[in-house]
């Protein structure tokens, strides 16, 4: 059986032994010599250093360090030397005896002035003299002027370089005239030139142009390119994108958020809306019309990757929200309110209505033929004197004659006759008194298949 010998306990280092045993005086002599550097080898080096210089070579009795720079192996790299700063001095602990007070005063004792000190007395002639007077003695002040009088003199110099401008005199009585420039006399000499004023406004015939159209010198500003291939198109359905867009990126919802500026955010992995993941910037909003809708758009910037230098790389996203559709224009088919071929009710006016047995109305047909159209106007007349057909006005400038069945009590009227207008005469508007209407030749467009009436509802426009 092999006996196991107890392991040898390692002795403490010389430095540790020196710290504990130096104060008590129980240190071995080899420990003291090694720590304090008083060994035989140290003494030989001290003696030899008197004649030769051995500094910086690292020659000593301690462990080999290879000098100040250390050992450098062949083909290798030197180790980095770390400078160790100075250690703090130890705190000296002062023992407190049993008779010392346990309360330490922080404020020094102040000097106390003893009460009851005598009042200092002032002697000599340099002090103030206090003179007491009785209540019956009046106070008299000597106000006699001195012999020497004070004289005040003033001197003024005139410098033309710093002279004040001419003073405007009080304006005279105003005048009543068409001239708005009333001169006011000024004192002094005038240093300016009087130029007679010219009138720019001139009288004309009234046909001169009074307005002009400026040239479009300002170039049109191009809008943001939101629908390019480099932008990802994302549609936002919630209405918070219009009022609080930051609530879709972060959970912080400020009370006052600017709506027309660029918003910046910190990159985060927890966002309320997944479409706004990695969004670090939302640019200013823009309103546009797209396919019949009003669209609210914002251009966003993502921060998908980060480089070592701290640069953020990511794509651009176009977030848009359709506010409301633009309704198409409602088309209403227009219909003529009156017929151009039957206007019998527009010409007959009955003054009074006689009994049915006393009158027998007869119908007279009057035909007026013009190129490309014909018109027949029936009129109703009576053989009695009380019923007379009077044509007020006509929608065409054509001659109108009375029939033989109309008999007036006094004499036979002679209606003014007008010669038929030549069809080749170019006439667009016919004027009768204070009213005008379009010429019937241009009521219809002959070259178009669809016939559209080219007149108003009643056929007349009051001037």
From Swiss-Prot:
Disulfide bonding pattern of the chain: 21-27
Keyword Disulfide bond on entry: yes
Gene Ontology annotations for the cellular component aspect, listed alphabetically: host cell; host cell endosome; host cell Golgi apparatus; host cell nucleus; viral capsid
BP term (GO), one: microtubule-dependent intracellular transport of viral material towards nucleus
Subcellular localization(s) per the UniProt record: Virion; Host nucleus; Host early endosome; Host Golgi apparatus
Pfam family, one: Late_protein_L2
Keyword set, alphabetical order: Capsid protein, Cytoplasmic inwards viral transport, Disulfide bond, DNA-binding, Host endosome, Host Golgi apparatus, Host nucleus, Host-virus interaction, Late protein, Microtubular inwards viral transport, Phosphoprotein, Viral penetration into host nucleus, Virion, Virus entry into host cell
MF annotations from Gene Ontology: DNA binding; structural molecule activity
InterPro entries: Late_L2 (IPR000784)
Maturation and modification: Highly phosphorylated.
UniProt keyword Ribonucleoprotein present: no
Residues spanned by motif Nuclear localization signal: 1-12, 444-452
Binding partners and assembly: Interacts with major capsid protein L1. Interacts with E2; this interaction inhibits E2 transcriptional activity but not the DNA replication function E2. Interacts with host GADD45GIP1. Interacts with host HSPA8; this interaction is required for L2 nuclear translocation. Interacts with host importins KPNB2 and KPNB3. Forms a complex with importin alpha2-beta1 heterodimers via interaction with the importin alpha2 adapter. Interacts with host DYNLT1; this interaction is essential for virus intracellular transport during entry.
Family statement drawn from the similarity comment of this UniProt entry: Belongs to the papillomaviridae L2 protein family.
Chain's role: Minor protein of the capsid that localizes along the inner surface of the virion, within the central cavities beneath the L1 pentamers. Plays a role in capsid stabilization through interaction with the major capsid protein L1. Once the virion enters the host cell, L2 escorts the genomic DNA into the nucleus by promoting escape from the endosomal compartments and traffic through the host Golgi network.
HAMAP family: PPV_L2
Protein name (database record): Minor capsid protein L2
Protein's organism: Human papillomavirus 45
